[in-house]
Amino acid sequence: MDFLTMCMLAAGFGMAIGAFGTGIGQGLAVKSAVEGVSRNPGASGKILTTMMIGLAMIESLAIYVLVVCLIILFANPYKDVAIKLAETVAK
């Protein structure tokens, strides 16, 4: 496999794993918040505020994964080295 194909696969798998993890984390957070509100409806405002802050923290992981994947795809610092290496091997 050439370098660009490996970069695309790495970015795809990285985003898939990151999205899977954040989806599971957000689902568990919402489940716990709903259970907490059903047990104590009087504390729903405090629970929902804490849940929203937690969801923002969890979602930031997906944003960081997206940024790293975009760097791998479009601003890879090793791209020039890999292309030169491939050219010398091809000769």
Swiss-Prot record:
Coiled-coil residue spans: none
Signal peptide per UniProt: none
GO cellular component: plasma membrane; proton-transporting ATP synthase complex; proton-transporting two-sector ATPase complex, proton-transporting domain
Sorted UniProt keywords: ATP synthesis, Cell inner membrane, Cell membrane, CF(0), Hydrogen ion transport, Ion transport, Lipid-binding, Membrane, Transmembrane, Transmembrane helix, Transport
Membrane topology (UniProt): Multi-pass membrane protein
Predominant localisation class: membrane
InterPro entries: ATP_synth_csu_bac/chlpt (IPR005953), ATP_synth_F0_csu (IPR000454), ATP_synth_F0_csu_DDCD_BS (IPR020537), ATPase_proteolipid_c-like_dom (IPR002379), F/V-ATP_Csub_sf (IPR035921)
Subcellular location, record wording: Cell inner membrane
Domain of life: Bacteria
Disulphide bonds in the chain: none
Pfam families in UniProt: ATP-synt_C
CDD domains, alphabetized: ATP-synt_Fo_c
Site (Reversibly protonated during proton transport): 59
Gene Ontology MF terms: lipid binding; proton-transporting ATP synthase activity, rotational mechanism
Record family assignment: Belongs to the ATPase C chain family.
Function: F(1)F(0) ATP synthase produces ATP from ADP in the presence of a proton or sodium gradient. F-type ATPases consist of two structural domains, F(1) containing the extramembraneous catalytic core and F(0) containing the membrane proton channel, linked together by a central stalk and a peripheral stalk. During catalysis, ATP synthesis in the catalytic domain of F(1) is coupled via a rotary mechanism of the central stalk subunits to proton translocation.
PANTHER family recorded: ATP SYNTHASE LIPID-BINDING PROTEIN, MITOCHONDRIAL, ATPASE PROTEIN 9
Classification via NCBIfam families: ATP_synt_c
Quaternary structure note: F-type ATPases have 2 components, F(1) - the catalytic core - and F(0) - the membrane proton channel. F(1) has five subunits: alpha(3), beta(3), gamma(1), delta(1), epsilon(1). F(0) has three main subunits: a(1), b(2) and c(10-14). The alpha and beta chains form an alternating ring which encloses part of the gamma chain. F(1) is attached to F(0) by a central stalk formed by the gamma and epsilon chains, while a peripheral stalk is formed by the delta and b chains.
Name of the protein in question: ATP synthase subunit c
Gene: atpE
